[in-house]
Every structure is written in structure tokens, then in C-alpha cells.
Amino acid sequence: MSTQLQHARDGTVTDAMRRVADREGRDPEVVREAVADGHAVIPANHHHDALDPMIIGRDFATKVNANIGNSDTTGDIDDELEKLHTAVHYGADTVMDLSTGENLDGIRTANIDNSPVPVGTVPIYEAVTRVEDVTDITPDLLIDVVEKQAKQGVDYMTLHAGVLAEHLPLTDDRTTGIVSRGGSILSQWMTEHGEQNPLYTHYDELCEILQAHDVTISLGDGLRPGSVADASDDAQFAELDTLGELTRRAWDHGVQAMVEGPGHVPMDQIRANVDRQQEVCDGAPFYVLGPLVTDIAPGYDHITSAIGATEAARAGAAMLCYVTPKEHLGLPDAEDVRDGMAAYRIAAHAGDVAAGKPGARDWDDALSEARYNFDWNRQFDLALDPERAQAFHDQTLPGDNYKDARFCSMCGVDFCSMRIDQDARDAGDDADDMTELTTETDLSESAAAEVNRPPTGTHDAPAAEQAPSPGDDDDD
């Protein structure tokens, strides 16, 4: 079967492209051209029946990925489906199952069966769980894992194929060395075997598998900087040059490709990083982790990274990988997922507003109008997180009568600036101008993409009892 890239190059507008066009408020032909040029991807495995197609590309609304998954100490199917539900409910455009513990197949298939958004994985994690030692990994094992996950319905896979043996000495003087799990695993394998990265040497064979199932390749940045001290160094950019080569080779196989990026980057270097990736990788979508702009705030890295993510989105990054408050500290739970998603939906939206994406500011205007009109219920409805917005308001003013009040508990009755301003205008010569100030933006007519209009996400809680049992896991 052909991939979305091959269909696009043949001039065919697929059903997935039409659905994407509707969600983005764009012409289907614009979508087809972006996919054909490699400037956008539609991760849509032929076997993912629950998928509602979406698009990742710099000319479209900025997307957000949420990482979920268990570890060797936590998590079962019910826990993971709760994280999936939380992530999608609060606006995740894709999720990555990064499980490294037990029941990998059961968790992965449950996520795919229940997820309306694309599901990504890092296949080398499963490979590690199937051997006694990292050095026991073989090219055949990696190929087997990739093929199995492709058949299960995984929509995109991170492959750290650009980490080459000759790059490793470039990391010797780093402050934090190699911080990518995939990158460190492959570094150990290459060092102990004295051989080249098997994902690189067997890349063409892997691409043939991905093409057969239309799995998008997400070229992992195994040498991304793990501290601002290591940002934009020779190791990072040597790998990036290889990722540019691998992007073009994926396209030659008809495989959709996006490229992953840092990491930890000072604010003043972010735009240059985005521009460099776009040039080296011929405009392939850039998928960035953060980046964190400072390293001083464990427990608040959803904030330090959302700052960098906003600038990355403004500069042209196509998708942001969220960071939760638990980053560098522990495995996130459902509440951490909620906080991470809020930070990154804000970052993506703010980046789109700053970049002038069509209709992106309409949501802001609608909420500002409701705020000025003291329409509390509409403010809650339009909020990024309606439940939290109303809960915070109702902590101090819980009564229904306060939903008609022209103040909140921040300023009280006498010091509300908007009430004072309205009263002054009503009493003055420009009272007729109030009509202009209280017009209401019609979001149903907005040109904004779906992700830049409320609600941010809706998702029925998955039926955990229908998920595969732990006994179904092939990895045990």
C-alpha cells in the first residue's frame, strides 16, 4: 500500500488529507502539496483504526505531543490508559508510548485501540527489554521489533539512526554527556562492538518496513544537548547533518519523515537552531523537546521548557514535545500530564499567535471580550482548562450570584479596573462607543485551525476492562 507521501506525490488527495484540511481550515490541495514536498507529515498507520488524522508541519498549527508510558517500577494498563485519556482530553495532538517496564505489547495495543491521535514509540526500548545486556542487541532484533510495532499500528517511530561512531568523541568535553536514552544505548553498543550504529547500517531495510505500513519516521536526536552549556555544539550539529541525509533517504523510500531537536538551549540560540534544521533537512517538520532555556528549576521544568517551546514555535518548529513538572525527577502521573499539557498548549498557541497563523488570535479576542463583559460562564467555557478556571474563581466566590458579578476576589467591588472603565465610559460623551468594545468574536467563523479553537480536547475515557490482560504480553 502507498504512503501518504507517495499518494501526495502522485497528485492524489486522500481521505486523510481531506480530514486534515477540514481540521486546519485549509484547502485540501494545500495539504497535499505540503506532504508531497516533505514539509508536513500525516502520521497514519494503515492499522490504526481509531485514528482521527492530523498533520505536522510548520505552515500548519503547532502541535503538541505528550509522552506517556510505564517504567520498571510503575504502571499497568489501567494507569496508562488514564494517562492517555488525560493527555488527549487536555489537548495532546499525538502521544508517545515510552514504556520500558512490563506488558509492553499489552499497553501499546491498548493505547492504539483507544487513541484517536497518532501513537509514537521508540522501538529500541523494547529491544533492550528483550536481552540480558545492551550489547546483546542485534540488527535482526531491531528489525523484528520495528516490524512488529508497525503491524500493531504504531503511527510514528523514533529511530536514532543519526548517532554515528565518529560522533561519539565530540561529546567528551560535554557537561552532561549523552542524555538521550536511545543515544546512550547506541553509544554503548557501538563502543563495545567497535561497529557502526545498526540503525544506520540497516536504514534502508527499516525504511522498507515503515513504507509498507505508512509509519512516519521521527529521526531521533540522540546527541541532543542535556544542558544549556552543551547547546549548539559540534556533536549536536554533526548528528543533524546526518539526519538531513537520512531525511532524504526516507523520502526516496516513500516514507514520511520528521526530525527531532533539542533539548536544552538558551533563548538566544533557539531561532538559529530551528533555521539550521530547516536548511539541513530541506524543510522537514521539526519536532522539539522544549527546549529548556535554563537548568536551575527542577520541579518547574514544564515552565522553563514552555518558554523555549514558545520561541521554537514562533521560529517554525512544527511540533512540541511536552515536559511535565516531574522532568529530571520522576515518572509523571495523570496530574503531571495535565500540567504539562496546559503549559505546552499555551506555548503552541502563543507561538501561533506570534507567527500570525490564520485566525489564531480569535480565541484570545473572544475570551478578552467575555472578560470585559463580566460573562463568567463564557470565560470558563473559553478557557484552556475550563474546570480549573472555574474552580479557582469559585474558591472565593462560589455562589451562582457571583456569575453575574462585575468583579472577582482579586480587586473586589471597588477596585475592579474594568468595571471602573465601563462606568466611566457609560457616563461620558463616548457612551455610544461601548457597542464597539463589547462586540463578540464568532469562533464558528474563525479561520483558525481546530487546535487554536476551544475546546482544547475531548476524549471519552477508555474502557480499561477491554484492554489486553498482562498475560497477553509477548515480552514476559
From Swiss-Prot:
Pathways involved: Cofactor biosynthesis; thiamine diphosphate biosynthesis
Residues that hold Zn(2+) according to the record: H264, H328
Top-rank taxon: Archaea
Protein family (similarity comment): Belongs to the ThiC family.
Disordered: region residues: 1-27, 425-476
BP GO annotations: thiamine biosynthetic process; thiamine diphosphate biosynthetic process
Keyword Lyase: yes
Cofactor(s) listed in the protein's UniProt record: [4Fe-4S] cluster
Gene name per UniProt: thiC
Known EC number: 4.1.99.17
Organism of origin: Halobacterium salinarum (strain ATCC 700922 / JCM 11081 / NRC-1) (Halobacterium halobium)
Cofactor binding, per record: Binds 1 [4Fe-4S] cluster per subunit. The cluster is coordinated with 3 cysteines and an exchangeable S-adenosyl-L-methionine.
Protein function: Catalyzes the synthesis of the hydroxymethylpyrimidine phosphate (HMP-P) moiety of thiamine from aminoimidazole ribotide (AIR) in a radical S-adenosyl-L-methionine (SAM)-dependent reaction.
Keywords, sorted A to Z: 4Fe-4S, Iron, Iron-sulfur, Lyase, Metal-binding, S-adenosyl-L-methionine, Thiamine biosynthesis, Zinc
Name of the featured protein: Phosphomethylpyrimidine synthase
Extent of Basic and acidic residues compositional bias: 7-27
Paired cysteines (S-S): none
GO molecular function ontology, one term from the record: zinc ion binding
